[in-house]
Amino acid sequence: MSDVLSQEEINQLIEALMKGELKEEDLLKEEEEKKVKPYDFKRPSKFSKEQLRTFQMIHENFGRALSTYLSGRLRTFVDVEISIDQLTYEEFIRSVMIPSFIVIFTGDVFEGSAIFEMRLDLFYTMLDIIMGGPGENPPNRPPTEIETSIMRKEVTNMLTLLAQAWSDFQYFIPSIENVETNPQFVQIVPPNEIVLLVTASVSWGEFTSFINVCWPFSLLEPLLEKLSDRFWMMGRKPEKVEERMEELRKASQKIPVTVQAVIGETELRLKEILDLEVGDVIRLGTHYKDEIRIDVEGRPKFRGIPGVFKGKYAVKVTGEFTNGGEYE
């Protein structure tokens, strides 16, 4: 297309400038953006946009499966957000905290190794909750052999989820080669090799941490032909998608949730709270014959009547809350 404007186009441009619909700075900025396109020779792009998009889809599937798995293990809803970046192996190693939980793994069809790295705050919080603790105040020290052995099994399960997410492109059986806590001792590829870094932001409540998966280019290069939207669409059979959705539905039904029967609530002044003693009676705004509120994960869900069942306190569900706060 020619860069020369017609007289009519010139008149329209001048009219837009006079009316303030278009600013001169915008034209200059647009022209400047067209002239210069930065390129980092130290970090050349090894992957096409299509391959990166497919890689993102693979690991978003992994993120959803990881969210379901962690929600079951930690007994609360865990949100997992996936992001992907391209950088050198040296830059990745420098970004890893010391100490950290670094798992070097491979697959039966891979030529080379990859890295699964978990931040220690997540490592110790998850370990403590699995062992029956509250998961608070994680220490900042290298894990012991016993702690490593327990969490190694958890990472093995997570790597299995990762392999399942890859199965539409390349089925592989993951295996752990080694575990380290100091990134300076981990050298799986040359420092200047390009790697794809998959970062999973793991959060629940006020807690947030990260899991990183580092894929070296040399390991992925033989698979690049399969990393395309076309291949992905051809490999996705409707019955297979439905089968996986059913698996996710079944897995989600096993996630434990907290159910609370709220007998009543009231408001007290700070002085009244400070003056409370053993034996004091606090009046609630609920009559003993009234229905009580039943919360699921802190949100009103049902109404019920308290009572006793087989020698234990219980509550009978009598109605359900609607979106407006009323109940049926």
From Swiss-Prot:
<dbReference type="GO" id="GO:0050918">
    <property type="term" value="P:positive chemotaxis"/>
</dbReference>
<protein>
    <recommendedName>
        <fullName>Flagellar motor switch protein FliM</fullName>
    </recommendedName>
</protein>
<dbReference type="InterPro" id="IPR028976">
    <property type="entry name" value="CheC-like_sf"/>
</dbReference>
<dbReference type="Pfam" id="PF02154">
    <property type="entry name" value="FliM"/>
</dbReference>
<comment type="subunit">
    <text>Interacts (via N-terminus) with unphosphorylated CheY. Interacts (via central domain) with FliG (via central domain or via central domain and C-terminus).</text>
</comment>
<comment type="similarity">
    <text>Belongs to the FliM family.</text>
</comment>
<comment type="function">
    <text>FliM is one of three proteins (FliG, FliN, FliM) that forms the rotor-mounted switch complex (C ring), located at the base of the basal body. This complex interacts with the CheY and CheX chemotaxis proteins, in addition to contacting components of the motor that determine the direction of flagellar rotation.</text>
</comment>
<keyword id="KW-0283">Flagellar rotation</keyword>
<keyword id="KW-1003">Cell membrane</keyword>
<dbReference type="GO" id="GO:0071978">
    <property type="term" value="P:bacterial-type flagellum-dependent swarming motility"/>
</dbReference>
<dbReference type="InterPro" id="IPR001689">
    <property type="entry name" value="Flag_FliM"/>
</dbReference>
<keyword id="KW-0975">Bacterial flagellum</keyword>
<keyword id="KW-0145">Chemotaxis</keyword>
<keyword id="KW-0997">Cell inner membrane</keyword>
<dbReference type="GO" id="GO:0003774">
    <property type="term" value="F:cytoskeletal motor activity"/>
</dbReference>
<feature type="region of interest" description="Interaction with unphosphorylated CheY">
    <location>
        <begin position="1"/>
        <end position="45"/>
    </location>
</feature>
<dbReference type="GO" id="GO:0009425">
    <property type="term" value="C:bacterial-type flagellum basal body"/>
</dbReference>
<dbReference type="Pfam" id="PF01052">
    <property type="entry name" value="FliMN_C"/>
</dbReference>
<keyword id="KW-0472">Membrane</keyword>
<dbReference type="GO" id="GO:0005886">
    <property type="term" value="C:plasma membrane"/>
</dbReference>
<dbReference type="InterPro" id="IPR001543">
    <property type="entry name" value="FliN-like_C"/>
</dbReference>
<dbReference type="InterPro" id="IPR036429">
    <property type="entry name" value="SpoA-like_sf"/>
</dbReference>
